[in-house]
């Protein structure tokens, strides 16, 4: 029984990859750099222009592409700065 329990714990750790979390920048436009820990394995940076000028949004994951918005997705820590 102990062997089965130990096996389940090891499989859970391997499947969940508990040893690594991604960090992405999440500041908006020209705000000071801020970092967040993400469950996703990628970061994004969206850039677009509106009546306020050039806008930048950063965060975790990789959202769907939209017209007139430049989107960069990347897969290393803080790669979206």
Curated annotation (Swiss-Prot):
Residues 1-21 form the signal peptide. It is found in: Secreted. Disulfide bonds join 24-43, 38-60, 62-73, 74-79. The keyword Nucleotide-binding does not apply. Expressed by the venom gland. InterPro entries: Snake_3FTx (IPR003571), Snake_toxin-like_sf (IPR045860), Snake_toxin_con_site (IPR018354), Toxin_cobra-type (IPR054131). Belongs to the three-finger toxin family. Short-chain subfamily. Type I alpha-neurotoxin sub-subfamily. This is Short neurotoxin 1. It comes from Cryptophis nigrescens (Eastern small-eyed snake). The lineage of its organism: Eukaryota, Metazoa, Chordata, Craniata, Vertebrata.
């Amino acid at each position: 029984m102990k062997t089965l329990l130990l096996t389940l714990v090891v499989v859970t750790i391997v499947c969940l990859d508990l040893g690594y979390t991604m960090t992405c920048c999440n500041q908006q436009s020209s705000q000071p750099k801020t970092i967040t820990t993400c469950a996703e394995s990628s970061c994004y940076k969206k850039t677009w222009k509106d009546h306020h000028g050039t806008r930048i949004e950063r965060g975790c994951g990789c959202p769907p592409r939209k017209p007139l918005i430049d989107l960069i997705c990347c897969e290393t820590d803080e790669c979206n700065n």
